[in-house]
Curated annotation (Swiss-Prot):
Residues 891-898, 949-969, 1033-1053, 1102-1485 are cytoplasmic. SMART domains: GPS, HormR, TSP1. Residues 1475-1485 have a biased composition (Acidic residues). Glycosylated. Autoproteolytically processed at the GPS region of the GAIN-B domain; this cleavage modulates receptor activity. Additionally, furin is involved in the cleavage at another site, in the middle of the extracellular domain, generating a soluble fragment. The lineage of its organism: Eukaryota, Metazoa, Chordata, Craniata, Vertebrata. One of its GO terms (molecular function) is G protein-coupled receptor activity. SUPFAM superfamilies: Family A G protein-coupled receptor-like (SSF81321), TSP-1 type 1 repeat (SSF82895). This is Adhesion G protein-coupled receptor B2. The modification Phosphotyrosine is found at residue 1251.
Length: 1485
């Protein structure tokens, strides 16, 4: 037994411990933190109502915050639970609040003997809340934690207590900031004090820094002395109402942020007298020394979360609720619904079939007594045939009949009509009556017991009267009938609900209206509002003011993005109102940057781009009116911080604000606004005609004590007392101005000029509209209204073409009027001009001009371009398309650099016209309008650049430096690259700001962006004029262009530029004016005229009047020019164009260039140059001419087989070896022409491949005969030189524009001295002999070779003729491959360099100059033919040929290697300058 005792003892102890340990304390112990104010019941505080349960409240910072508790005595709670409070420095989670048992109390008393009194006070810190006899107990604690305990044993309490007792709010908690008490917390304390006074029959008071409550003069305040806690318990500022107390002075102690103090008051003590200081509590306007109670209006709390949808499929509904904080001290109750419901669309219900309407109930089964009746319904299956409906087919119900009476039956009363069977297209309603009795024979009542009538006679909407399903902005809008409003969730980046109405057009077709986002708030703006509330919760004023600065900065950044909804604008107005109120309450002076940001935010909000958003937001709340009030309050907040005679000017893009402070006693001068000459003023203000003149007589108070209702607040309904400032709309608290006697000694005068506010304010009654800018004038304190109107206002129009203008002012007393809030009785219209209207008003307010808009305004808002713009663009486009079609049809014949430039120019004009029409549509989005403006800027500039490109092309053609491939790339860079560069730089610097506005899709007239178009256009016009002057001087110069075709082309380009460029400038200038001022019919008509004329002029100049196009059209029609030979590249034969190969064209161009080449040019203009140019790559630069040292010859390589004669020359007097002289070719208009130099041909055939290179720059073609060129004696020719043989008539008429060569001789030119003959022989060239055929007179023009040779011999093909013409030069091989060209080019260069070296060695010993002179004019070419077949030379001619061949062989082949005189062709005409001009004449021998 002894071993069992310890075991039993351990079991008992375990049970005891198990009973003592209760895990419930964690369930009935709660800790609350962050509670500012609340009233709680037992159910709220204690989830488990048991003894020892506790609820602990945490004070976040006892040094800054004070914790007040009010205990509302409830007898049942006190009797069953005995609640008490314990102030704690530390929170213990498992601390129990049970009272100790009597035995434990004795033990604790014995153990605590000898402890100090402080520890005893700590141990006895529990405060019995029910010890007092009064209904209230007020407690104030400065501890970290306050714990509420249930100390009694409520064994039967939960069951005995009534539900009302459990729900009774017996504890109220209030947390107050000692440094900055808010109006709400002070209002709660005042309410407690009033309730205490009413319950005790006297006034109760306690001290709290920063709070004061109204009381009656002479009343007393007493602290409660009822039985309560022991004297050891100190309750700071505590008031426990109870038993009698000695009377005391009734004064509520107050404090301020500059004079803070706290009083410790024990039970039975009286509060000390405190001085009166300035507070933030309102005071009576009639009795300044008496404090008034703060009026607290009811405020809605945040909406709760939406409930689940009422249906799991199909369409149901969702709801949410919100609670209202009750009003106090006569405040207004909360306005608006407490419950909000919306539709919800779930997934379609999985029903295969659909039941139709129930049929009517059948008759009752019995005529009397109880019975049953049935009804049935049908299943409508739209799917497969096997689908069925789920549910019962029939329905049965009981029918109660009366007992079968023994007497005759009768009908009972009719019941109510049933619901209509259809909602549209005529349904049916039924009602029934019962037969109350039957006859003795059991027969029913006579008559019918059912009655039917039609209902819902309105027709169902047709298919075209239903708006279809649409997916817009990530939202799906279900189909709806016309007139219905559909609600949907906001886009993912916002919260709230969006709505959209299905409208009906004038043609009876339903369409969706614009979605309404007035109830959508972006997440960024909601986060900013939460940040604002966090700053408001801060106790310190300085922190709250700095927080408001951060809020304004963040709001400016959000609005600068310009991506917000209409609901965000209303939310921003509310944020600005809270910021202004916080600045007032905290007495925080905003910095200059804060003021600038604030008004910049307002400028963003009232921008004209937000007109549609404001129209949408006005359907929910008059946000623009609220914004107007907030701006006025902020102006006076800034003005109060200014010094006397100090002013402030803030300028933004959409409003200008002037704030100044003037003393009441002496206003310095009259006030004029705005001051346009101030630095930093915007252009729209500087150039506007808006003006305000406020005479200083208006600025006078009505009386020293009570100013009159005037100023911006002086409109009807806006009068306030001298110590208050009217709050903005929706304010729940008013700003309290300090009771400073100097406050009313200064005027704060504010003036605001709004650029676009008239577009967003509620419109006046139709048909009027706000036609001018809006100006606001506000003065505080309010002034005495003058007896007669003295305020002069001039307002400029923002809508042109208006009629019947009226001056009006905004009436704040009718802010809720639906018809508008403009009042025309306050102002008088003095003068109306074309640009502005002058008004004279009596009261200070917000002013504007109301007028009737023009009739075409409705057409403009429809979104279609005006008729003149459409006509002008259409005519211009049709003309240009005609030009493009003609060029496309004959492109192979008119292809040139000028044609390519013209096509690009036409494309730029076509694109500009299309973009002008697109930009006039009002349905474009912001991004599309910006892109339209940028591309319009680009094509406008490109059209100017292509005109400049045409002028540049004509200039290059005039000076002869035209290289096709290289210049074409430069033309493209100038025509398209330069405009693209200008637009890219403009877009990069402005970030597309200014590209497109709310009124037009073009460059904005503000900010200087328009200079990005005007500047380059002006520079292009100036450069074009300079080039035109240069080209004109070149054409008119005596030594100008000799080539008639070049001269004609250059003149045509110059004339085109002179005509097209001014017309282009006028067209685009009128286009800019027509786009920016869409209501001006004059500008639109001018643009239509200029644009149409531009298209016709371009088509006429470059198509109908262009020679190439005329020739092509004539040849296509079979009418060709008869004066051109068929060898010409532009000639026709039998109505068909003669197509030349590329190589032939290059050869012909080279030959023509030789004849009409300018001085000092260095282009490949001969056959050799053509070959060298063809042998180069496309991107390779052509080589320059071979220029030797000064005084040396310049040779160019020639095509063909070059064999340098290396054989020794025969001796003197010996005949040279027989050889055949190669033909000589000269360049003519039609190509190469072979010269028949019979005096150079030996009798024997020569070897192939020998050439004689004649130097350039010395060829002289002069008419023969006496006195040619002014010389007395004809030039001699070497002895033995053969005379020219006469030509037949057939040969002389075969070539156009060439003179026949009557004589050709070699003579000694005086420019190079005499030739030093090493053999000592003297050569005397014989005098020239006139031709046997003819001798042309000086100055006579002879056409011996016509261009067109009729006859069958000239009917061969063009290609055969070209081959025959170039057969001697072996061009057939050259035309085969490009590689052959390159080989010939490099081979000729190498051989001629060797030949030049031989010539340079013999130049020093030769002093004579050989020249070849020929008859004919200086500007004509020499062409000769071969001798007629069968004609044999005479003996004398043969001897001359031998002597000449001997001389040639001796001089060119057998001279020693010494420096020789260069062999040149010399212009021997006496009328030519001494210094020979540069040329490029080359002849092949």
């Amino acid at each position: 037994m002894t071993p069992a005792c310890p075991l039993l003892l351990s079991v008992i102890l375990s049970l005891r411990l198990a009973a003592a340990f209760d895990p419930a304390p964690s369930a009935c112990s709660a800790l609350a933190s962050g509670v500012l104010y609340g009233a709680f019941s037992l159910q709220d505080l204690f989830p488990t109502i048991a003894s020892g349960c506790s609820w602990t409240l945490e004070n976040p910072d006892p040094t800054k915050y004070s914790l007040y508790l009010r205990f509302n005595r409830q007898e049942q709670v006190c009797a069953h639970f005995a609640p008490r409070l314990l102030p704690l420095d530390h929170y213990l989670v498992n601390f129990t609040c049970l009272r100790p048992s009597p035995e434990e109390a004795v033990t604790q008393a014995e153990s605590e003997v000898g402890r100090p009194e402080e520890e005893e006070a700590e141990a006895a810190a529990g405060l019995e809340l029910c010890s007092g006899a009064g209904p209230f107990t007020f407690l104030h604690f400065d501890k970290n934690f306050v714990q509420l305990c249930l100390s009694a044993e409520p064994s039967e309490a939960p069951r005995l207590l009534a539900p009302a007792a459990l729900a009774f709010r017996f504890v109220e908690v209030l947390l107050i900031n000692n440094n900055n008490s808010s109006q709400f917390t002070c209002g709660v304390l005042c309410r407690w004090s009033e309730e205490c006074g009413r319950a005790a029959g006297r006034a109760c008071g306690f001290a709290q820094p920063g709070c004061s409550c109204p009381g009656e003069a002479g009343a007393g305040s007493a602290t409660t002395t009822s039985p309560g806690p022991p004297a050891a318990h100190t309750l700071s500022n505590a008031l426990v109402p109870g038993g009698p107390a000695p009377p005391a002075e009734a004064d509520l102690h107050s404090g301020s942020s500059n004079d803070l103090f706290t009083t410790e008051m024990r039970y039975g003590e009286e509060p000390e007298e405190e001085p009166k200081v300035k507070t933030q509590w309102p005071r009576s306007a009639d009795e300044p020394g008496l404090y008034m109670a703060q009026t607290v209006h009811g405020v809605w709390e945040e909406w709760g979360s939406w409930s689940l949808c009422s249906r799991s499929c199909g369409r149901g509904s969702r709801s949410r609720m919100r609670t209202c904080v009750p009003p106090q001290h006569g405040g207004k109750a909360c306005e608006g619904p407490e419950l909000q419901t919306k539709l919800c669309s779930m997934a379609a219900c999985p029903v295969e079939g659909q039941w139709l309407e129930w049929g009517p109930w059948g008759p009752c089964s019995t005529s009397c007594a109880n019975g049953t009746q049935q009804r049935s319904r049908k299943c409508s299956v739209a799917g497969p045939a096997w689908a069925t409906c789920t549910g019962a087919l029939t329905d049965t119900r009981e029918c109660s009949n009366l007992e079968c009476p023994a007497t005759d039956s009768k009908w009972g009363p009719w019941n109510a009509w049933s619901l209509c069977s259809k909602t549209c297209d005529t349904g049916w309603q039924r009602r029934f009556r019962m037969c109350q009795a039957t006859g003795t024979q059991g027969y029913p009542c006579e008559g019918t017991g059912e009655e039917v009538k039609p209902c819902s006679e309105k027709r169902c909407p047709a298919f075209h009267e239903m708006c279809r399903d649409e997916y817009v902005m990530l939202m799906t809008w279900k189909k709806a009938a016309a007139g219905e409003i559909i609600y949907n969730k906001c886009p993912p980046n916002a919260s709230g609900s969006a709505s959209r109405r299905c409208l009906l057009s004038a043609q009876g077709v339903a369409y969706w209206g614009l979605p309404s986002f007035a109830r959508c708030i972006s997440h960024e703006y909601r986060y900013l509002y939460l940040s604002l509330r966090e700053h408001l919760a801060k106790g310190q004023r300085m922190l709250a003011g700095e927080g408001m600065s951060q809020v304004v900065r963040s709001l400016q950044e959000l609005l600068a993005r310009r991506t917000y909804y209409s609901g965000d604008l209303l939310f921003s107005v509310d944020i600005l109102r809270n910021v202004t109120d916080t600045f007032k309450r905290a007495t925080y002076v905003p910095s200059a940057d804060d003021v600038q940001r604030f008004f910049q935010v307002v400028s963003f909000m009232v921008d004209a781009e937000n007109k549609e958003k404001w129209d949408d937001a006005q359907q929910v709340s008059p946000g623009s009116v609220h914004l107007l009030r907030v701006v006025e309050d902020f102006i006076h907040l800034v003005g109060d911080a200014l010094k006397a005679f100090q002013s402030s000017l803030i300028v933004t893009d959409n409003l200008v604000i002037s704030i100044q402070r003037e003393p009441v006693s002496a206003v310095s001068s009259d006030i004029t606004f705005p001051m346009r000459g101030r630095r930093g003023m915007k252009d729209w203000v500087r150039h506007s005609e808006d003006r305000l003149f406020l005479p200083k007589e208006v600025l006078s108070l009505s009386s020293p004590g009570k100013p009159a209702t005037s100023g911006a607040a002086g409109s009807p309904g806006r009068g306030r007392g001298p110590g208050t400032v009217p709050p903005g709309p929706g304010h729940s608290h008013q700003r309290l101005l300090p009771a400073d006697p100097d406050e009313s000694s200064y005027f704060v005068i504010g003036a605001v000029l709004y650029r676009t506010l008239g577009l967003i304010l509620p419109p006046p009654r139709p048909p009027l509209a706000v036609a001018s800018r809006v100006m606001t004038v506000t003065v505080r304190p309010p002034t005495q209204p003058p007896a007669e109107p003295l305020i002069t206002v001039e307002l400029s129009y923002i809508i042109n073409g208006t009629t019947d203008p009226h001056c009006a002012s905004w009436d704040y007393s009718r802010a809720d009027a639906s018809s508008g809030d403009w009042d025309t009785e306050n102002c008088q219209t003095l003068e109306t001009q074309a640009a502005h209207t002058r008004c004279q008003c009596q009261h200070l307010s917000t002013f504007a001009v109301l007028a009737q808009p023009p009739k075409d305004l409705t057409l403009e808002l429809a979104g279609s371009p005006s008729v003149p713009l459409v006509i002008g663009c259409a005519v211009s486009c049709m003309a240009l398309l005609t030009l493009l079609a003609i060029y496309a049809a004959f492109w192979r014949f008119v292809k040139s650099e000028r044609s390519i430039i013209l096509l690009n120019f036409c494309l730029s004009i076509l694109a500009s016209n299309i973009l002008i029409l697109v930009g006039q549509s009002r349905v474009l989005s912001k991004g599309v309008c910006t892109m339209t403006a940028a591309f319009l800027h680009f094509f406008f500039l490109s059209s100017f650049c292509w005109v400049l490109t045409e002028a540049w092309q004509s200039y290059l053609a005039v000076i002869g430096r035209m290289r096709t491939r290289l210049v074409r790339k430069r033309f493209l860079c100038l025509g398209w690259g330069l405009p693209a560069l200008v637009v890219a730089v403009s877009v990069g610097f402005t970030r597309t700001k200014g590209y497109g506005t709310s009124s037009y899709c073009w460059l904005s007239l503000e900010g200087g962006l328009l200079y990005a178009f005007v500047g380059p256009a002006a520079v292009i016009v100036l450069v074009n004029m300079l080039i035109g002057i240069i080209v004109f001087n070149k054409l008119m110069a005596r030594d100008g262009i000799s080539d008639k075709s070049k001269k004609q082309r250059a003149g045509a380009s110059l004339w085109s530029s002179c005509v097209v460029l001014p017309l282009l400038a006028l067209t685009w200038m009128s286009a800019v004016l027509a786009m920016t001022d869409r209501r001006s019919v004059l500008f639109q008509a001018l643009f239509a005229v200029f644009n149409s004329a531009q298209g016709f002029v371009i088509t006429a100049v470059h198509c109908f009047l262009r020679r190439e196009v005329q020739d092509v059209v004539k040849c296509q029609m079979g009418v060709c020019r008869a004066d051109e030979s068929e060898d010409s590249p532009d000639s026709c034969k039998n109505g068909q164009l003669q197509i030349l190969s590329d190589f032939e064209k290059d050869v012909d161009l080279a030959c023509q260039t030789v004849l009409f080449k300018e001085v000092n040019t260095c282009n490949p203009s001969t056959i050799t140059g053509t070959l060298s140019r063809l042998s180069l790559d496309e991107d390779e630069e052509p080589k320059s001419c071979l220029v030797g040292p000064e005084g040396s010859l310049s040779f160019s390589p020639l095509p063909g087989n070059i064999l340098v004669p290396m054989a020794a020359s025969p001796g003197l007097g010996e005949p040279p070896p027989p050889q055949e002289a190669n033909p000589v070719y000269m360049c003519g208009e039609g190509g190469l022409r072979q010269l028949d130099l019979t005096w150079l041909r030996p009798t024997e055939p020569g070897s192939e491949g020998d050439y004689m290179v004649l130097p350039r720059r010395t060829l002289s073609l002069q008419p023969g005969g006496g006195g040619g060129g002014g010389e007395d004696a004809p030039r001699a020719r070497p002895e033995g030189t053969p005379r020219r043989a006469a030509k037949t008539v057939a040969h002389t008429e075969g070539y156009p524009s060439f003179l026949s060569v009557d004589h050709s001789g070699l003579g000694l030119g005086p420019a190079y001295g005499s030739l030093q003959n090493p053999y000592g022989m003297t050569f005397q060239p014989p005098p020239p002999t006139p031709s046997a055929r003819q001798v042309p007179e000086p100055g006579e023009r002879s056409r011996t070779m016509p261009r067109t040779v009729p006859g069958s011999t000239m009917k061969m093909g063009s290609l055969e003729r070209k081959k025959l013409r170039y057969s001697d030069l072996d061009f057939e091989k050259v035309m085969h491959t490009r590689k052959r060209h390159s080989e010939l080019y490099h081979e000729l260069n190498q051989k001629f360099h060797t030949f030049d070296r031989y010539r340079s060695q013999s130049t020093a010993k030769r002093e004579k100059r050989w020249s070849v002179s020929s008859g004919g004019a200086a500007e004509r070419s020499v062409c000769a033919d071969k001798p007629s077949p069968g004609e044999r030379p005479s003996l004398s001619q043969h001897r001359r040929h031998q002597s000449w061949s001997t001389f040639k062989s001796m001089t060119l082949g057998s001279l020693p290697p010494k420096p020789r005189e260069r062999l040149t062709l010399h212009r021997a005409a006496a009328w030519e300058p001494t210094e020979p001009p540069d040329g490029d004449f080359q002849t092949e021998v």
